[in-house]
Amino acid sequence: DAIYIWTDTALFIMRFVGAPFTFSFQQVGTNCGLIGQNAAVEVDGTAYWMSENGFFRYTGKLESLSCLVEDFVYDDINTTPKQHINAGLNNLFGEVMWFYPNSGSGVVNRMVAYNYLDSSVERPVWTTGTLARTAWQDSAVFGKPHATEYNEDGTTATTDTNYVFGNQDGTSTYYEHETGLNQVKEGQTSAITASIESGDFDIGQQGLAGDGEFMMKIRRVLPDFLSQTGDTRITLNLRDFPNQTQASS
């Protein structure tokens, strides 16, 4: 029953109130403006967006999202082409994603995602990656998420009937996500290679004092992979001190 209006520094709510004023405008937050015009998404009545000051959501009250990868994102983001930064919703897995260019790129080449289903105040779930999508539509329209990827170096030959003849200004690939096991791009099919890496673990649970002063011994790993297809390799990166170079198992 409301429309969100962002500036680059604040959030306003517009509501219909009837005659004589028709609409009311209420400022509900400051220092939480939108980093780019496409950097917000709404999920079940909650708005999520990316600001120059971090990640936020509005549930009837303004909330700053605790983000463990915030420095990783904001220390290496190119905010000059703000119009390229865009948000996407993957409601099949409860994820809100933001696609952005890093400091060495003028086009989108990075992604940061927040899982709003699995997150809690004590344990927010964030991931980062190199998935580059310039536009995203969730599964509500096509049944699966659909998105595009832009390649600024892409060109087409004048004899290529799959593209605009003689294009020299980059190419875009149109994807359907969350379907099949392989990537199909430009007529080529290849297996999707996936990986995930966590942050460091230390012993500091169950009220133990001296956080970071205990040595951890790992005897075995019991994975719980559901519907696994193919082989999976688990690598443990070990170090005794925070600034020490990691050694892999």
Residue ranges and their predicted role:
Residues Y4-G29:
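Surface-exposed extracellular loop regions of Gram-negative outer-membrane beta-barrel proteins
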Residues Q27-T46, E52-S249:
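Beta-sheet repeat architectures centered on beta-propellers
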